[in-house]
Amino acid sequence: MGSEINDNTIEFDVLKNKEDLTKEILNEVYNSLKEKGYNPINQLVGYLISGDPTYITNYNGARALVRKLERDEILEEVLKSYLGIK
């Protein structure tokens, strides 16, 4: 009864998971910056242009989170979202 075997193959979509991870991290970083009283968009733009992580607060581990992503990958996902490209 509880030992039925599922013969279906589960597909793992690396690109979709990367998009989800990027969005999740950016949302967490945005919220942390906002909670600390910063303008989150200005701070994120400063970080993306300069690569200087001090634009991002350490609050809630936001700086460590954003550094898990490559800046070019963040920009790629932001542009895809803005242009409505999947």
Swiss-Prot record:
It comes from the Bacteria. Transmembrane segments: none annotated. InterPro entries: IreB. NCBIfam families: PRK05473.1. Belongs to the UPF0297 family. This is UPF0297 protein CA_C1679. It comes from Clostridium acetobutylicum (strain ATCC 824 / DSM 792 / JCM 1419 / IAM 19013 / LMG 5710 / NBRC 13948 / NRRL B-527 / VKM B-1787 / 2291 / W).
